[in-house]
Amino acid sequence: FSGRLKKAFLARSIAADRSVHRVEALLRLADVLGIPRVGQVVVPQGGLPPAAPSGPFAVIHAAPMFTYKQWTVEGWRSVAAALAARGLTVVATGGPGEAERAYLDLVWKGSDIVRLDGRCNWGQLSSLLARAKVYIGPDTSVTHLAAGAGCPTVALYGPTDPRLWGPWPVGGLPEAWLATAPVQNHGNVWIVQHAFPCTPCQLEGCERRLTSDSACLKQLAPAQVISAMEQALGPSLRQ
């Protein structure tokens, strides 16, 4: 509503602030209603999927919903190799859709990993993420779930503005994410970006469509992601 309609139908209103994180914007509704803020994300609960590894493992979620949020096949393989070299079983997650499965078949062809794509419900996925030593994924819902589950989370961001849509760390966000930085960290979340002058553009890829590539992601170096991954893993699993 706006103008006279807002006054006619709403007892109280707050102005939309599109410059703050979306979680913070929603928490402001609680302030207006006099409800104490709870900045902790409550994730679904469920048991581990039957095929979950018994030893230490890492989770990679390589397939976002849209092409313009995809990284590179070579990048994902490099990260998986780095995790395996640190003694971690690599678990690949993903949805059941045909296009997503085809992309993951391409990414993980010939790889010695545990594939759980299409085999976890949300509760099982949440439990899996809570047990993982580290999670690496693009800007997608599972990345936000990993952050909420308390997993050390490495998020690969391209066109999306982390100031508005960055993963929300356990315990809340102590200060705003920067628009662009090679690596930035708050709590259990690390955001990795390739610093193009146009990043973050908030557009659907360089060709302005869901199926286009984003140069800021395609040029994101595996070494940069692996460096953030090592920070997230901590000293005991670094090389």
Model features per residue range: what roles?
Residues F1-Q239:
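Catalytic machinery of carbohydrate-active enzymes
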